[in-house]
UniProtKB/Swiss-Prot annotation:
Family: Belongs to the universal ribosomal protein uS4 family.
Disulfide cysteine pairs (residue numbers): none
UniProt-recorded name of the protein: Small ribosomal subunit protein uS4
Function: One of the primary rRNA binding proteins, it binds directly to 16S rRNA where it nucleates assembly of the body of the 30S subunit. With S5 and S12 plays an important role in translational accuracy.
Ranges where the S4 RNA-binding domain occurs: 88-153
Superkingdom of this protein's organism: Bacteria
Amino acid sequence: MARDMSPVLKRCRALGLEPTFLGIDKKSNRNFARAGKKISEYGTQLREKQKAKFIYGVLEKPFRNNFDKAKKLKYGTTGENLLILLELRLDNVMFRMGYGRTRTEARQIVDHKHVLVNGKCVNIPSYQVKAGDVISIKEKCKSAQRYKDILEVTDGRTVPAWLEADHENLTGTVKEIPTRDQIDVPVNEVLIVELYSK
């Protein structure tokens, strides 16, 4: 599957993004403030889009597809709906529940067919979960050292209120669809809408 392979910390610096939003504890040695000429309105809008794509690990075509889907929804604002759709990706939900140290690792776990949604194997990272969905690691995979190592890192993280995770049994439930104030990504979605509306 194609994805952005640029060095993570370098990309974070370019976007003014703290690595912790990606699940990475490493700190950049450089200051996040970037000197130079003032960014244009278009440049600011473009950077917000790039930031959202980078956080969720989504390339342009699927990102645009999510935007078009968000635009057609009959409720909420397009920008908020876009972020909600990105949050409801299976790879992101796995990351949020603590079953991946990063979204990239969570995506690999889904790709490798370790994940069940309502008892059925799903290996599509972009799969959209729904309220009430029960997500679990396959029984034969639960004893793998990989998950012990992951939980050593993620067990102390706060699971969002719209999700429930049972780390002992490697399961979780989507309690509800998240609202914008439950999504902690530092993205101004209004600027993304303005960019695509040009």
